[in-house]
């Protein structure tokens, strides 16, 4: 599963060029989570999860507070959570998660992104069955043995444990996300290199250079769409 960590790491490296876009996406996600439940993360697991993710992207406190205050203030702006599935060059698979206040606009933009970059939209379920929803939590400063021990003490049986680039990564069930984080926090860990719930492909495919260039453009175009929150795929980009 190490390659999946590489994909997230590449996204984090790229964010330096797109901080305003990343922050805007988090602002929307935090607002939606706070609006759908209590604006207190200790009483709202969805909000708590988004805030933990936001920390790993260094989202400024002011943006977080503004989004929560907007939700508290009774804003009537509503967003729909949507998932689109589709295919890129050579049958590569793509999942697009969006938060939108205009479903028709988002569907049109996502469809155009696929169509102009060697892909096409699929029906619901055409791609997702080839991915596993997985909690991914990574820390520095602990060995695999350290992490295995703390997980055992917390009575947590996770999917996988990988050490890579001085980062120890835990792959767990989605509903274990907070329990794994809490197990780390009990040992004094306060910062996480990665804290995500991601869609991990069961198998990856490699593309020709030409197809990969087109595929990377497709992903870039999708990620640049204002309403798109996450893009998952099954291509080994070889990075």
Swiss-Prot record:
<dbReference type="GO" id="GO:0006355">
    <property type="term" value="P:regulation of DNA-templated transcription"/>
</dbReference>
<dbReference type="InterPro" id="IPR029072">
    <property type="entry name" value="YebC-like"/>
</dbReference>
<dbReference type="InterPro" id="IPR048300">
    <property type="entry name" value="TACO1_YebC-like_2nd/3rd_dom"/>
</dbReference>
<keyword id="KW-0963">Cytoplasm</keyword>
<dbReference type="GO" id="GO:0005829">
    <property type="term" value="C:cytosol"/>
</dbReference>
<dbReference type="InterPro" id="IPR026562">
    <property type="entry name" value="Transcrip_reg_TACO1_YeeN"/>
</dbReference>
<keyword id="KW-0804">Transcription</keyword>
<protein>
    <recommendedName>
        <fullName>Probable transcriptional regulatory protein BH3259</fullName>
    </recommendedName>
</protein>
<keyword id="KW-0805">Transcription regulation</keyword>
<comment type="similarity">
    <text>Belongs to the TACO1 family. YeeN subfamily.</text>
</comment>
<dbReference type="Pfam" id="PF20772">
    <property type="entry name" value="TACO1_YebC_N"/>
</dbReference>
<dbReference type="InterPro" id="IPR002876">
    <property type="entry name" value="Transcrip_reg_TACO1-like"/>
</dbReference>
<dbReference type="Pfam" id="PF01709">
    <property type="entry name" value="Transcrip_reg"/>
</dbReference>
<keyword id="KW-0238">DNA-binding</keyword>
<dbReference type="GO" id="GO:0003677">
    <property type="term" value="F:DNA binding"/>
</dbReference>
<dbReference type="InterPro" id="IPR026564">
    <property type="entry name" value="Transcrip_reg_TACO1-like_dom3"/>
</dbReference>
<dbReference type="InterPro" id="IPR049083">
    <property type="entry name" value="TACO1_YebC_N"/>
</dbReference>
<dbReference type="InterPro" id="IPR017856">
    <property type="entry name" value="Integrase-like_N"/>
</dbReference>
């Amino acid at each position: 599963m190490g390659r999946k960590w590489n994909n997230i790491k590449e996204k984090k490296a790229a964010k330096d060029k797109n901080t305003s876009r990343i922050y805007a996406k988090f602002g929307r996600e935090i607002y939606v989570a706070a609006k759908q439940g209590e604006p207190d993360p200790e009483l709202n697991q969805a909000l708590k999860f988004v805030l933990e993710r936001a920390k790993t992207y260094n989202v400024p406190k002011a943006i977080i507070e503004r989004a929560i205050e907007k939700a508290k203030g009774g804003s009537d702006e509503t967003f729909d959570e949507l998932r689109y599935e589709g295919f890129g060059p050579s049958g590569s698979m793509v999942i697009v998660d969006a938060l939108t206040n205009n479903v028709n606009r988002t569907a049109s933009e996502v469809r155009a992104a696929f169509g102009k970059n060697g892909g096409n939209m699929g029906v619901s379920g055409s791609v997702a069955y080839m991915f596993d929803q997985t909690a991914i939590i990574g820390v520095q400063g602990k060995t695999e043995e350290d992490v295995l021990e703390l997980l055992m003490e917390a009575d947590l049986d996770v999917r996988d444990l990988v050490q890579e680039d001085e980062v120890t990564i835990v792959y767990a069930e989605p509903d274990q996300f907070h329990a794994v984080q809490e197990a780390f926090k009990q040992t004094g860990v306060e910062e996480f290199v990665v804290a995500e719930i991601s869609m991990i492909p069961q198998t990856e495919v490699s593309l020709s250079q030409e197809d990969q260039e087109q595929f990377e453009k497709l992903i870039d175009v999708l990620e640049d769409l204002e309403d798109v929150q996450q893009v998952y795929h099954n291509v080994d980009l070889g990075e």
